[in-house]
Each structure stands twice: as C-alpha cells, then as structure tokens.
A protein has these predicted regions:
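Long C-terminal interaction/binding lobes of large macromolecular proteins
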Residues: 1-284
Length: 284
C-alpha cells in the first residue's frame, strides 16, 4: 500500500553538475539523474542533527550520511573525488536552507567582528570547473598518471595527521628527558613522512616508462620509495594543484567606512569552510 502522505515527502530542490562530470568514481558509485546532473534533496531533521554531532563530524560519517540522503545519485560518497565535494555541500546547503548565508568575520587591523551575507549561488558559479589533468611528465620518457584524491583518502589523511599532531603536543608537554623527546619526535617525523609517501602512492594510477605502461602497485610503490626528491616534489605539487580544482573561492568582504578610518583595509578575503556543522546551522 502506498503511504497516503508520500506527496508531502521532501522532493528535489535543485540539481547540480559536478566539476569532474562523473570521472574518477568507482564503478557503480554514481548515477546521474538527468544529462550529467544530480538531484539534491533538502536535509531531513535527522540529517540536520547528524551535522551537529561533533563525534560524527570528526570522522566524516555525518557528511557521508547526509550526502547519501540528500544526493542519492552519489551511491558511494567515500569514493567521490574531493574536487566535487564543495559543489555537493553547497548544493545541500542551498536545497536545505536557501541561497543566502549570514557569516561573521573578524576585520584585519581593527580586530572587530562584522556580519556579512553570502550568495551561495554566486559562489557555486565561481567554482573552478577546469578539467583535471592526470599527467605529470617527469622526463621525456617518463610520465606518471595520477587521480584526484577521494573523500575517503582525504578523511584518512586528516585523521592520521591530526593524530600525529596530537602526539607532538603530548611529547612536547610530557615529562621526559631531551634525548627521549628527540627520539619520539624522530619517530613522529618518520610516520609523517610515510604518510605523505603513502598518500602519493595511492594517487598514482600508472607510470609510462619508455612506452611501457606499469600499473602494478608493487612496482609503483618501489618507484615512489626510490625516486629522487625532485621527482617526488613535482608529483606532489601537481597533485595538490589539481586537487584544488572545484574549491570555492574566498569571500571578498567589503569593510564599513568607519573601520577603514580606523586603519582596516577596504576589502579583504575570508575563506568559508563547508565541511562542518556551522555551515548547516538553521537560523532560530
């Protein structure tokens, strides 16, 4: 029997197109609703409560659940390239709470707080949708093909980085000798180095060497471990620059004249964080 209340269920509020156009997703992880677009539903009451749960936000499980709920075409948000993340979260925010958003920012020089209204549709339009370039030419006969970082990869990297930073603080504040601290710091540094290299290895799809295409993970891992630092820097710089595609631009804030007279700049840029509960707070 069909629920007689189903006509009151939430319906798609907007549709979005992804910066990646659906590339780099795992098989079966994405189903477009119409012509390379995805429908976005408003958040449910449960979704809003999830986005205000600090524990769930810490490991990104709240964000994953909300994306599954509001953008059901993304069947596996963990495999979503981070390039698409800002577009998806902006879409959920607009569908749920509207196109405008009030934020508070601290004005440089005078250190005073002002409120500012952001047009999220404009921010969506300003997102860089340039095509991801997967190729890094290291030498005329050596080219590395990379992929965007996935949301799972980003989350794991953030959690592991946070854990190492927390350990640095604990060691610095701990009651141990200087030599013991140096030993602990060296171990933490080694783990951070391995974390960076592991992240790079995960981002490499294949390597073309003298016309031979190598996709074997073991060979790729050995190459990353043994290549010269200049090559590693080139790969890392390329991946970082390409992963920045799809990001929202900082907000340009106009400063009130009275604050400018006190020494504040006429305008300044302010970043807007999307992947946290503040972005999804409903006005009371």
């Amino acid at each position: 029997m069909v629920n007689p209340l189903n006509k009151y269920f939430r319906k798609p509020a907007i549709s979005i197109s992804l910066p990646t156009q659906g590339e780099f997703y795992a098989p079966g992880a994405l189903t477009f609703d119409n012509d390379k677009e995805l429908n976005v539903f408003p958040m449910t009451a449960r979704d809003e409560m999830m986005m205000n749960s600090p524990d769930a936000l810490m490991n990104s499980s709240a964000t994953i659940d909300v994306i599954k709920s509001c953008v059901p075409g993304i069947r596996d948000p963990w495999s979503m390239p981070v390039i698409d993340l800002d577009t998806v979260l902006l879409g959920v925010r607009i569908a749920s709470l509207g196109e405008s958003m009030d934020i508070s920012v601290i004005v440089p020089k005078v250190e005073e707080t002002i409120s500012y209204t952001v047009d999220l549709r404009v921010m969506m339009d300003q997102i860089d949708r340039s095509q991801f370039n997967p190729y890094v030419v290291l030498e005329p006969t050596l080219t590395v093909k990379v992929k965007p970082m996935s949301y799972r990869q980003l989350t794991n990297l953030q959690l592991r980085t946070y854990e190492q930073q927390r350990m640095i603080t604990q060691v610095a504040q701990g009651k141990m000798s200087a030599s013991e601290k140096n030993k602990e710091f060296n171990e933490i540094f080694n783990r951070m180095t391995n974390l960076t290299l592991d992240n790079m290895k995960e981002g490499v799809l294949e390597i073309n060497a003298d016309g031979d295409v190598i996709t074997e993970n073991t060979y790729i891992s050995e190459f990353v471990d043994n290549m010269q630092a200049e090559m590693a820097s080139k790969i890392r710089t390329h991946i970082d620059s390409q992963n920045s595609l799809g990001k929202i631009k900082p907000i340009t804030v106009q400063v009130p004249e009275d604050m400018v007279k006190k020494g504040a700049p006429t305008t300044f840029g302010s970043p807007l964080s999307l992947d946290n509960s503040n972005f999804f707070v409903r006005k009371s």
